Swiss-Prot record:
Sequence similarity: Belongs to the phospholipase D family. Cardiolipin synthase subfamily. ClsA sub-subfamily.
Cited PANTHER family: CARDIOLIPIN SYNTHASE (PTHR21248), PHOSPHOLIPASE D (PTHR21248:SF22)
Compartment(s) where it occurs, according to its Swiss-Prot or TrEMBL record: Cell inner membrane
One example GO MF annotation: cardiolipin synthase activity
PROSITE patterns: PLD
Name of a matching Pfam family: PLDc_N
SMART domains: PLDc
Primary location: membrane
Residues passing through the membrane, by range: 3-23, 38-58
Repeat listed as a keyword: yes
Protein name: Cardiolipin synthase A
Membrane-topology annotation of the record: Multi-pass membrane protein
Domain of life, per lineage: Bacteria
Length: 486
């Protein structure tokens, strides 16, 4: 019996070390950033069981077998649709401003289509204005409404939007609603999901959280887009979830969430529609390719029209494109670079691009919330401040609530607005969307919004920052080391 237990003990030890060696080899064989690989190895060797379980759950990008097969199957028809769209030459911009030219070329070559012109844009900075505009557009909808949100939180004005959407479905408008399973857990536990389905709305719970499948699909891969398309002509996107900030996370101690949304009319709705179509097919297996733009209603010839490129990210979409777009935008800046984000945990490449811009004379400003709802990200972001301040970057800490807007403005003309945070999760993991806008008028509007944010912020003083307590520096460096995993 003693011999038996000895053999079992040695087999357990051997299996344990073989498992660690196998995971270590897998980490080393994957082409990933060195800091990320080192962080995973440290966790695995300090806390082996916890580290191995964490790596198998979150260390690699698994969409899941069924969704991955759908993603592969949809691309032939999607590629044909994109190729057919190129025949609508009148919707594509032929020229761009000097500051936007490189970025638009990058997007065209990576995604297969160019930027579309003749769009009308409106920036909405108040949640009530967003909800009221959306309700009006839903009430006027005649054919179809598609929505996707990370969070739908019942209560307040969000319920009014839900009522208008159900009314549209009852009068014959084809309504589709896709919500992230983790972000919208309160919605799916409420009566609203059943009420909407009973009204005729197709409601889909995207990337459903299932602990039984934790090793088969990465559970922290989330559907983070916020998009609305109405009648293939009107579109919305930006940082705002379908929540009323007067009711949302009031106990978090960070104040009301401050967001920005763009309302658009024009052919950009078609390019956003194909993104939604891909998401819908990956999640449901059903193909809903949007129709081409209607020449009779698009304001193609209007001189005031905005030129827009839509960048989508996530499994099945061009890899690393949003990260490349941010780098290209930073290196294109000659005079001003203003960034707004709630979560700032940049890659080394993006950090260097921002610092380099400041060091070559560009006026660089980053606007972040002073209080953050994520303790981990809040501390990790502080670890980058010293390097940014030394390079001459201005860091503004917003004090009017949780600044949730995600925006970049380059030289007052090139704008990036959407759902992407400047952190690892948005850059390389989640399903995200960003609008790239080449227009000085829109840039002026965005600059006014950012100036308002700055007026409600406190400029971080470099000398005072360097005198912060030692314990804060230690905590910052600890979270900085694990920043590749956040």
């Amino acid at each position: 019996m003693t011999t038996f237990y000895t053999v079992v003990n040695w087999l357990v030890i051997l299996g344990y070390w073989l498992l660690i060696a196998g995971v270590t080899l897998r980490i080393l064989m994957k082409r990933r950033a060195v800091p990320s690989a080192m962080a995973w190895l440290l966790i695995i060797y300090i806390l082996p069981l916890v580290g191995i379980i964490a790596y198998l759950s979150f260390g690699e990008l698994h969409l899941g077998k069924r969704r991955a097969e759908r993603a592969r199957a949809m691309w032939p028809s999607t590629a044909k649709w994109l190729n057919d769209l190129k025949a609508c030459k009148h919707i594509f911009a032929e020229d761009n401003s000097p500051v936007a030219e490189s970025l638009f070329k990058l997007c065209e070559r990576r995604q297969g289509i160019g930027g579309v012109k003749g769009n009308q844009l409106q920036l909405l900075t108040e949640s009530d204005d967003v909800m009221q505009a959306l309700i009006r557009d839903i009430q006027l909808a005649r054919h179809n409404i598609e929505m996707v949100f990370y969070i739908w939180q019942p209560g307040g004005m969000a319920d009014s939007v839900a009522e208008s959407l159900m009314a549209a479905a009852r009068r014959g408008v084809h309504c589709r609603l896709m919500l992230d399973s983790a972000g919208s857990v309160a919605f799916f536990r409420s009566p609203w999901a059943a009420m909407m389905r009973n009204a005729g709305i197709e409601v889909v719970e995207a990337l459903k959280v299932n602990l039984m499948r934790v090793f088969l699909r990465r559970m922290d891969l989330r559907q983070h887009r916020k998009m609305v398309m109405i009648d293939n002509y009107i579109a919305y996107t930006g940082s705002m979830n379908m929540v009323d900030p007067r009711y949302f996370k009031q106990d978090s101690g960070v104040g009301q969430w401050i967001d920005l949304m763009a309302r658009m009319e024009g052919p950009v709705a078609t390019s956003m529609g194909i993104v939604y179509s891909c998401d819908w097919e990956i999640e449901t297996g059903k193909r809903i390719l949007p129709p081409p733009p209607d020449v009779n209603i698009m304001p193609f010839e209007e001189a005031s029209g905005h030129t827009i490129h839509t960048i989508a990210s996530g499994p099945g979409f061009p890899e690393d494109l949003i990260h490349q777009a941010l780098l290209t935008a930073a290196y294109a800046a000659k005079e001003h670079l203003i960034m707004t984000t709630p979560y700032f945990v940049p890659s080394d490449d993006l950090l260097h691009a921002i610092c380099t811009a400041a060091q070559r004379g560009v006026d660089v400003s980053i606007i972040l919330p002073r209080k953050n709802d994520s303790l981990l990200v809040g501390w990790a972001s502080r670890a980058f401040f010293t390097e940014l301040l030394a390079a001459g970057v201005k860091i503004y800490q917003f004090e009017g609530g949780l600044l949730h807007t995600k925006s970049v403005l380059v030289d007052g003309e090139l704008s990036l607005v959407g759902t992407v945070n400047l952190d690892m999760r948005s850059l390389w993991l989640n399903f995200e969307i960003t609008l790239v806008i080449d227009d000085a008028g829109f840039g002026s509007d965005l600059a006014a919004v950012q100036d308002d944010y700055i007026s409600r912020s406190r400029l971080l003083d470099a000398r005072r920052w360097l005198k912060r307590p030692l314990w804060q520096r230690i905590v910052e460096r600890l979270f900085y080391f694990f920043s590749p995993l956040l």
